Amino acid sequence: MNKAVIYTLPKGTYSEKATKKFLDYIDGDYKIDYCNSIYDVFERVDNNGLGVVPIENSIEGSVSLTQDLLLQFKDIKILGELALDIHHNLIGYDKNKIKTVISHPQALAQCRNYIKKHGWDVKAVESTAKAVKIVAESKDETLGAIGSKESAEHYNLKILDENIEDYKNNKTRFILIGKKVKFKYHPKNYKVSIVFELKEDKPGALYHILKEFAERNINLTRIESRPSKKRLGTYIFYIDFENNKEKLEEILKSLERHTTFINLLGKYPVFD
């Protein structure tokens, strides 16, 4: 029986595109499958599948739900990463007849200036692909969708304007999650992701964490705080850093002195 790599519906999203790219790197007989939400992906993966979920957008920031679930599902690890260029397109029937534009909230936010210039109303839906589907099924010329070229092709709609995003360096990082995987090859770049809680909330507490990395010449690629969900004003921290095989065990051991817990979320290759 084929094993599955799972992403979130609907079809035609960047999540599907990222899943297909990961499939090119994975060694083994895998099929693509899908479910309804990021949480559902984690649940399916917990039963020995693989999953692909977004974790960070260069414009809108991190995907909080993905970060929370990486902490909640402790047996699931980050196995790989890739980034996709995100280009938004106006999709529909006739640009001059559009009154309302629909899309995912992040896509609407990333095209705010373009939408404002045209004076259109906006409506948020759960995904860019769902927006394109709504426009296709409604056959309403006053509706436009913001979505990908793949979605437009899938639903046989026109691309009325290309690359309408406000910022042209728009990228989204996707991660492959699961318990284990074998890749066809290993790229040069590797990352490590951890999450931890500081032992004491006092001046300089985070400095001592960062100092451990600086003393070992380990480069951080991301640091971010999230509410601990224990009480207001308490936080946990997520850090990504470039993998240093010789110093990895040493740095993790050194961080234990300053933290109440530290979880290794994954050691993984970064694919182009």
Swiss-Prot record:
One of its GO terms (molecular function) is prephenate dehydratase activity. GO terms for cellular component: cytoplasm. Its EC number is 4.2.1.51. It is an enzyme of class 4 (lyase). InterPro entries: ACT-like_dom_sf, ACT_dom, Preph_deHydtase, Preph_deHydtase_CS. Pathway: Amino-acid biosynthesis; L-phenylalanine biosynthesis; phenylpyruvate from prephenate: step 1/1. Keywords: Amino-acid biosynthesis, Aromatic amino acid biosynthesis, Lyase, Phenylalanine biosynthesis. SUPFAM superfamilies: ACT-like, Periplasmic binding protein-like II. Residues 4-179 form the Prephenate dehydratase domain. Optimum pH is 5-10. Residues 194-269 form the ACT domain. Thermostable. The record marks T172 as: Essential for activity. GO terms for biological process: L-phenylalanine biosynthetic process. It catalyses: prephenate + H(+) = 3-phenylpyruvate + CO2 + H2O. Inhibited by L-phenylalanine but not by L-tyrosine or L-tryptophan. Pfam families: ACT, PDT. Homodimer. NCBIfam families: PRK11898.1. This is Prephenate dehydratase. It comes from Methanocaldococcus jannaschii (strain ATCC 43067 / DSM 2661 / JAL-1 / JCM 10045 / NBRC 100440).
